[in-house]
Amino acid sequence: MKLRASVLIGATILCLILSACSNYAKKVVKQKNHVYTPVYNELIEKYSEIPLNDKLKDTPFMVQVKLPNYKDYLLDNKQVVLTFKLVHHSKKITLIGDANKILQYKNYFQANGARSDIDFYLQPTLNQKGVVMIASNYNDNPNSKEKPQTFDVLQGSQPMLGANTKNLHGYDVSGANNKQVINEVAREKAQLEKINQYYKTLLQDKEQEYTTRKNNQREILETLSNRAGYQMRQNVISSEIFKNGNLNMQAKEEEVREKLQEERENEYLRNQIRSLLSGK
């Protein structure tokens, strides 16, 4: 009886083991460019594009936020989702700040799922470390009846609604015509124009200075050349004078020699005459 019970228990355990082995887990698939093993393929869904939020896509808004300016990265983890949600639902993005930084943000947004039909406008400025982003999804037509709403995106708080609300950077964005933002951008453009004019004037001054230096160098070379020619002429004249002096000296020496020779000849004749007169 005990033996039969033991056999029955063993058979039951064997059946359970075989049943468990027959329902083995499905093999997981390792995706490319990943060092970890993901979940089963049944749980992986791929989308051709990120869907829009029904409320945000139908709500006109203009949002201005001051994006961070970290050295090694752009956004904190807690800021990424909300910022991309804002960017993805916008029709127009204006980035104001350092030229390299705003270009990094633009490329970052476009490379990480932002809609391809978003219009990006870059406004580079000097002496501004951070980046200001103005995002809107409403019609820019001043006759439009759409009124934008303001959201404190990076803080993740509730929408700040109302006629006199202000966003993070202190601008009133409750109306479709954001005069303060427009004036700020206009001031930035005027500043850039002044800077461009300054560098243009500086370049013209440098070109004028270079031209003046070249002219001075040419005048100096001409002066040195004239002096060298004058010195050469003086040397030639001096050489001619020296040569003429030598010739005159030689002529005088020759004249002296001739006179001496004539004196010797005269003395010789006088001696001959004296000898004849004395009868010797």
From Swiss-Prot:
Lipid moiety-binding residues (S-diacylglycerol cysteine): 21
An example Gene Ontology CC term for this record: plasma membrane
Domain of life: Bacteria
Signal peptide per UniProt: 1-20
InterPro entries found in the cross-reference section: Cag12 (IPR025264)
Record-level GO BP terms: protein secretion
UniProt protein name: CAG pathogenicity island protein 12
Organism, as annotated: Helicobacter pylori (strain ATCC 700392 / 26695)
